[in-house]
Amino acid sequence: MLVSINWIRDYVDLDGCDIKELINKFTLATAEVEDIYYMGRDVQKVVVGEIKTLENHPESKKLHLLTVDIGDRVVNCVCGAPNVRVGQKVAFATAGGRVVAGEISKATVAGYESEGMCCSEKELGISDENSGIMELDPSYKNGTDIKELFPIDDIVFEVDNKSLTNRPDLWGHYGIAREFAALTGRELKPLDLADLDSDSENVVPVTIGDTEHVFRYSCLRMANITKHVSPMEIRIRLFYCGMRPINLLADLTNYIMLEIGQPTHAFDATKIDHIKVDMPKEDIDFTTLDGTTRKADTNTLLIYNHDEPVAIAGIMGGLDSEIVGDTSSVVLESANFDGICVRKSSSRLGLRTDASARYEKMLDPELTLVAIKRFVKLVKDIDSGAVIDSKLTDEYAKKYPQITLTFDKAYVDRYTGIEISNERIIHTLTLLGFGVDEKDGVFTVTVPSWRATKDVTIKADIIEEITRIYGYDNFEITTTRSPLKPVHSAPERLVGDEIKDILVKKYSMHEVHSYIWCDKKKYKKLGIEVEDNVKILNIENSDNGVLRDSMLPTLLVAAYENKDFADSYGIFEIGRVIEGTLENGYCNERRHLGVVLFSKSQSERDLYYKAIEVVNCIFEQIKHCAPKFAKIAPVHAWQHPKNTAAVLADGNEVGFVCALHPQNASKLDKTGSAVCIEMDIDKFSDAKAYDIEFKEPSTKQSTYYDLSLVLRKGVTYDELSENWKSMNIEELESVKLIDTYELLGTKSITLRFTFSSHDRTLEMEEVQGWIDEILHRLSAIGVSLRV
């Protein structure tokens, strides 16, 4: 939110204050300030000028040759504005001066000398209007500095909206001014409000059909409005605070919202004669002020004229009842709606506005009348002929209870840890608008309405109010005397960190960070469908409307988008997936590891065995055991129908290794290959971790024996290994896969057997005996020696 210091000065005397230091105090005490902008700093030596003569440029249809009276002299100027004319008063930037675009100097333009520039509002940085030069009041004296006429100089600071979530009173300048008053110890001036008394017998009838979500609805009709352009001061303030000036009535509703934080809405009075606030009985199409037709469902609060919807309550008005430049009578709405209802409607409709952002914070219902009185005051100040044309209608359906908190001085001392005098406590709370009564060291504090909606509710909140204004930087810093205890991380998080170390340090993989929702357009490029996944309600972008049930599609998209940057690489991520819903209806959220190995030079088979090696390494390093693999049918359509294997720990499935389905693989890359790993981190973390058994290395020479075996179709590695494991050969140190080979449907592998003894060097005859027995056992399952 953008805040104008000039606006704040309307309510707090800041003379003598260091504004930058004051803003810093505001950051420490109230809300974070993200940036400070010095408006008007770039505008220098811009004065009132009067066009004395005008000639068309002899060689240009757009340029004009002017003489301009700037008070102490008459200067020449070449100007291309379409609205320039003789006798016109303009904002003239003299040579040596500055505008937003830069310094102005004497120059020759199209062959003629120009000693300055006639400025548009955009060039002065006070609006986006750039269709012509700025026209000034004819009564302004030539040569008068433009800054003496308009509040161009200002300091605007930007407050982080997240800091204001629990402070609905700070969504307007008056609430910020109250904070500044408390920080400086100065008086907060009251708002200048109008009296709403009227001789008119007219009434704008209001019917509240939904009293649960409509807390208060106030409205009033005004007529005989003849002025339609806002004063420059109001337009500049709106522009500096991020609003686009439109017309007087629209500008004033925005002005009041920025001033006190209360949204208002002005309806064309010729189109409104009986207001009803309720939810529709069935879904309807409604066109809002931005020209977009939206579907309002039966949970959306609407404003009706009789039975015709004219606005979405708390969010935006309708196109058919909007005020235009020449509107002369309005019905002003100032209401208070349930913030949760407004937020949900805003989310469903995909429409978030400045008004809805404020209603979401649970505004003070007492502001509705303040806003109407302020609107009437401003309209009458600008247009003296405007009149109140109805009685005030004020339907107050639901009031917040008054909150009174009682505590003693000892409570303050205990929770602050310092001595703050009774006088300072009373003074601080009074400046913030709290009612305070103190008797015998016991304080009775009445919370003001603008802090009672969801902000200050318990005694500890009062302590916060006292200490933040006192200044946290005024507390004496002391070293903690409590014992320091180590932080215990969740086992699955520690396991995740260990896996990351293995993948990065041993296999040089790259970690990816992605969103849990699916980008359906990107998935579709790879032929991956996610329509059966858990869906997100009220999503603004329909392409991101489902949650992933596997880490791998996200990683495959990343591989697809980066396939041209490297020939071979591995990427991984540990993230959340949603595996359907539980019996209680909640999402079944799990933490999974996903790995994609991609290569344009290695075959799918080589990548598959590398994936097996990666899984083996993870198990050996963390669980100190080897995993088991079992062929399974694919769970996802993008998995290879044959080359998919479950990863087992203690007989329980904790993940899988798979190649891609040929159709998906061709869409990923026609010449490259990809193999995937996915593991449930939670299940893997819960699996048994075996003790590390130290086996002293043998001092004797090891004996290696390579066997090239021809496998029958369907034989698994587990079936092979069971044959030599059952022999319990103590001297068999390890068995490793060295190579694989396939030709004409026949598959062969090469295994390296390593034998070693601690007390002797093995004889070749002894080793050969074991090998012969292994071959004999393998022959029983259809495995033969390749010759």
Listing of model-derived features with the role each one plays in the protein:
Residues I5, N24, H64, L188-I284, ...:
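Glycine/proline-enriched, intrinsically flexible loops and inter-domain linkers
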Residues V3-I8, D154-S163, F215-A223, D354-M362, ...:
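Short, hydrophobic beta-strand segments
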Residues E113-E123, N130-M134, P151-I155, T300-Y400, ...:
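Mobile "lid/hinge" segments at catalytic clefts and subdomain interfaces of large enzymes
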Residues V48-V78, T253-D320:
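Conserved mixed alpha/beta core segments that line enzyme active sites in large multi-domain catalysts
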Residues M1-D197, V331, G350, D354, ...:
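Phosphate-backbone binding interfaces of nucleic-acid-interacting proteins
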Residues G40-Q44, D197-S198, T446, L484-S489, ...:
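Beta-rich nucleic-acid/ligand-interaction surfaces
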Residues L431-F434, T444, N588, S601-V787:
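A carboxyl-terminal module marker
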Residues L405-K409, D413-Y569, T754-S756, E766-V787:
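Extended, well-folded interaction surfaces typified by the phenylalanyl-tRNA synthetase beta subunit core
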